[in-house]
């Protein structure tokens, strides 16, 4: 039985909770944490997680020996600290995208994983959809011949109010805009299908959101 703690009770947490609840013979959620504990309490009630303990800080959970896996569902600027703390405490971690808000933080997370022997995963669910898995098979087997060009578009509407949430829209807390927020799925998928690029040329801009520092449009060419 994998004993799970979910850190962050915001909009993405139900996806993680439902995923674990789909396998009751293999997973059990034993803890929920949010800086606003009443949000965690609501998730506990909504999903009938009767045995789950509520916390307001992830540090309160580090010494628990009955946690095997931690889902990190918090804003990007907190990912590195939380993931590193839990890996050093002997827990495996599943981190929501984006991995972190800077490359330096990503490097520290990877280094900690190697040092501790913990397992760290980053959410990239598109790899596991049937169409993408079929594309991967076609690319790997050469069924379609040599692929000379691939194009990915991620046209995702973000209304002006999207950035009214306190942590969204700043370089410090979110680390980026559309590129890290949703295009990261397409970048991951393209890299998985085609391999890592040798050269990247990109343009980022904020065209429509005066309440955000980060980009709301990005265009890149990968070679």
How would you name each of these model-derived features?
Residues 78, 98, 121-127:
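Rossmann-like NAD(P)(H) cofactor-binding subdomain of soluble oxidoreductases
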Residues 3, 28-29, 66-69, 92, ...:
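Structural signature of beta-strand start/N-cap positions in the alpha/beta core
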Residues 27-29, 51, 67, 147, ...:
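Core-facing hydrophobic residues within beta-strands of well-ordered domains
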Residues 1-48:
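N-terminal Rossmann-like dinucleotide-binding module
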Residues 56, 95, 124, 201-204:
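Short loop/edge segments at beta-strand edges and connector loops
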Residues 220-223:
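Active-site beta-strand termini and strand-to-loop segments that position acidic
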Residues 119, 126-212:
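Predominantly a Rossmann-like dinucleotide-binding segment in NAD(P)-dependent oxidoreductases
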Residues 16, 49-112:
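Beta-loop-alpha module in the N-terminal Rossmann-like domain of NAD(P)-dependent dehydrogenases
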């Amino acid at each position: 039985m994998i004993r799970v703690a979910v850190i962050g009770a915001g909009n993405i947490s139900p996806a993680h909770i439902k995923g674990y609840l789909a396998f009751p013979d293999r997973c059990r959620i034993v803890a929920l944490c949010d800086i606003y504990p009443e949000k965690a309490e609501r998730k506990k009630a909504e999903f009938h997680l009767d045995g789950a303990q509520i916390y307001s800080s992830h540090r309160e959970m580090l010494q628990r020996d009955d946690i095997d896996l931690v889902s990190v569902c918090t804003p990007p600027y907190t990912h590195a600290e939380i993931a590193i703390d839990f890996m050093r405490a002997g827990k495996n971690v599943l981190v929501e995208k984006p991995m972190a808000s800077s490359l330096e933080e990503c490097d520290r997370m990877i280094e900690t994983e190697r040092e501790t022997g913990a397992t760290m995963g980053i959410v990239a669910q598109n790899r596991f959809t049937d169409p993408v898995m079929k594309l991967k098979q076609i690319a790997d087997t050469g069924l379609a011949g040599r692929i000379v060009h691939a194009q990915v578009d991620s046209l995702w509407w973000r209304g002006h109010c999207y950035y009214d949430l306190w942590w969204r829209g700043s370089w410090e807390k979110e680390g980026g805009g559309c590129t890290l927020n949703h295009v990261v799925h397409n970048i991951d998928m393209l890299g998985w299908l085609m391999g890592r690029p040798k050269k990247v040329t990109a343009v980022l801009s904020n065209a429509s959101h005066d309440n955000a520092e980060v980009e709301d449009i990005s265009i890149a060419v990968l070679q």
